[in-house]
Amino acid sequence: MKVKRKIFWGALITLGIVYGDIGTSPLYVMKALIMDAGGLNGLTEDYIIGCLSLVFWTLMLMTTIKYVLIALRADNHGEGGIFALYALVRNKKKWLILPALLGGAALLADGTLTPAVTVTSAIEGLKGISIGSQPWINTQLEVNLVTFVILLVLFLIQRFGTSFIGKAFGPLMLLWFSFLAIFGIVNLIHEPLVLRALSPHYGLMLLFSPANKVGIFILGSVFLATTGAEALYSDMGHVGKRSIYLTWPFVCGALVLNYFGQGAYLIKNLGNFKTTGDIFNPFYEMLPSSVYLFGVLISTIAAIIASQALITGSFTLVEEAVGLKLLPKMKVEHPSLSRGQIYIRTINWSLCICTLLVLVYFRTSERMEAAYGLAITITMLMTTILLSQYLKDKVNVVFNGIFLAVFLSVELIFLISSLTKFTHGGYVTLLITLLILLIMVIWYFGNKLRDYLSDEEEWVSLRDYKDVLQELSNDDRIPLYISNLVMLTKVDKRTYKVKRETLYSILDKSPKKAKVYWFVTVNTTSDPYTNYYTVDMMGTRNIVNLQLYLGFKMDHRVNLYLRQVVEDLIENDIIDEQPQKYTTMPGRKIGDFRFIIIQELLSPNTRVRGWQHLLISARIFIQNHSTNPIQWFGLEFSEVKVEKVPLLLKKRRIPAMEQRMILNPKDVKRSTKE
C-alpha cells in the first residue's frame, strides 16, 4: 500500500513539474495553424485533418520516441538535459563542446518567450467576458497589463521559494489535463471522423496540398506542439524517469484528445464562423458557455505553473553550466530546505526583464507565436548530435545511424520551416541566444586559452618548497600570521605543480607564518553528485594538499567541507591539535583560519596580442563582473584576503638597458676577482 501511495504522489508531482510547457501548447497551436491558413475563411476539412495528423505524429516522433523512449535512457546518475548529457560524452570528442554551448544558449533564450506566450494566450480568453454588466477585460492593452502584473509577481516571489505553493501544482495540473481530455472528447463525439488524422497519410498530403498556403513552413507552427519535450528531458532529475514513463501516456492522451476536439469543433462549424477583429482561439471557442470562465481560470493557472517550471528549469540549467565551467560563477541561494529548490538572482531578474520586454514588444499572443519555437529547434538538433555520441557505446551502429539520420533530417526540416519566424520576431530569441553563446564562448575558451598560454616558468612544484614552508612555520623570529592558512588554488595531483604566485603570496609578501598550510583544489566531476576528498600530507604534519571532488550540481561551500576534513584529520592523528586557551567553545581542537584568494589581472608585460588578447581580456572582464569568489565558496562569514596579481602569458622580453653613468656613490665596497 505504501509503495502504491509513493508511486501515486510521485506521478502527481511529475504532472506539476515536468509538463507545464508542453501541457499548455493546446492554448496556441491550433490558433497558429488557423493563421497559417489565412484565417477562418481559409480553413477546409482537408486542411484541418492534415494539421491534426502533423501535430499527432510530431508528438509521437519527437516527444514519445526521441525523448521519452530514447533520451530518458541517457541519464547522468538520474540527471537529464543537454548539459548533463554533455557531461556524459565530453571526454569522447573535444568538438562536442560546440553543440552543448549552442544548444544550452538557445534553450535559455527560448525561455524568455515561453512565459509571455502562455500567460498572454490564457488571459486573452477573458476578453469580452462580462462580470456583472461590464466586460472585465475589453482591450489588448488590458490583457497585457494583467499579464505584466502576473509575470512580475511570479518573478518577485522566486527569492522566497515556491515550495509553499508547489505542493498544489500536481493536483492543479491533474485537473488541467483532465479538463483537456474531457472537453476534447465532448467535441470529438460530434465529429468522430477526425480520427482519420491518426494516419500519417493526411499530414504528408497536406504538405503538398494547395489548401496549405505556406507549404513546408506550416511545420513551424506544428512544431509548437512539442516545444516542451526538451524541458521534459531536463526535468528528469527532479522526478525520475519512472514517473515520466508512468505519466506520459495520460498526458499525451489528454493533449491528443484536446487537439482532435478542437479540430472536430472547427470542422463541425466550417462556414458558420463570424469573423471579427478579435483573435480566434478554438481552444476557448469549443468550450460550453457554462464552463468558459472556469476554462480561462484553469488555463491561466496552468500557464503560471508552466512559467514557474520554466524559471526553475532555467536556474537548474545555469547551475549545471556553472558547475561544468561553461558560465562564470554565480551565487546560488537555497530559499527552502529542499535540495532542489535553488534561486539565482542574476538569472531571475535577467529572465524577468527579457520576458517583460518581449510582452511589451510583441503585445499579442498571435505575434509571439509567429516568433516562438525557432531557438528550441536548434536545441533539439544539438541534443540529437550529443545523443548519437552517447548511443555509440550503448547500441549497434545500425540503430545509431538510423537514429541520427531520421532525427537530424526531421529536425533540420523543422529548423528550415521555422526560419520564416526570423522576420516575424524570431530574431529576438536568436539575438538573446547569440548573447548567451558569446558569454559562454568567452568564458570556456578564455579559460582554455589562459591555461594553454600560461608561461611554464609560472608553475613550480609544491614539493620543492616543502622544507621552506616547514622552516617558516617553526621560525620563532617571525610572528604568527594565522593558525591555519588556506590557499584556494590548483595543485596538480600528479606533479604537484602550483602557480608560483601562490607560494609568492606566502613567502615573499611579508612571510605568512602558520601552524598548518592548506592548499585546497576544487575539482568538478561529470557525475552530478560526486562528494569526496583526498589528502596528501607530503610526509609532513602541517602541509595539506587537499583535493575536493564535487559533482557539477554540488555546492562549492569550501568552509563546510573543510570543517569536516579538519575533524577527520585530527581524529586520525594526521595533523596536530591546536588547543585554544581563549575560546567560547570548550574543548575546541583547532585554531583560526584565514583564506587567501588570488585574483588575476592581465599584465601589460605580455606578448599576447590580437584575438587572444581580446579573448583573455573579455574573460577577465566577465570574471570581475560576476559573483564574488567569496560568495561562491561560501566564505561570507570567514576571514578572507583577496590578493591581486598579474596574469603573465608569454612574458614580453624587455631589452637590457646600457648603464651610462652613476654619480657620487658613497663607500662603495668593491669585490676583487682573482
Swiss-Prot record:
Q: Which GO terms describe its cellular component?
A: plasma membrane
Look up the domain of life of the source: Bacteria
Q: Does the keyword Acetylation apply?
A: no
Subcellular localization, as worded in the UniProt entry: Cell membrane
Q: What keywords appear on the UniProt entry? A: Cell membrane, Ion transport, Membrane, Potassium, Potassium transport, Symport, Transmembrane, Transmembrane helix, Transport
Its transmembrane ranges are 7-27, 52-72, 95-115, 145-165, 169-189, 204-224, 244-264, 291-311, 342-362, 368-388, 397-417, 425-445
UniProt topology in membrane = Multi-pass membrane protein
Q: Which family does it belong to?
A: Belongs to the HAK/KUP transporter (TC 2.A.72) family.
Question: What's the stated role of this polypeptide?
Answer: Transport of potassium into the cell. Likely operates as a K(+):H(+) symporter.
Name of this chain's protein: Probable potassium transport system protein Kup
Native organism is Ligilactobacillus salivarius (strain UCC118) (Lactobacillus salivarius)
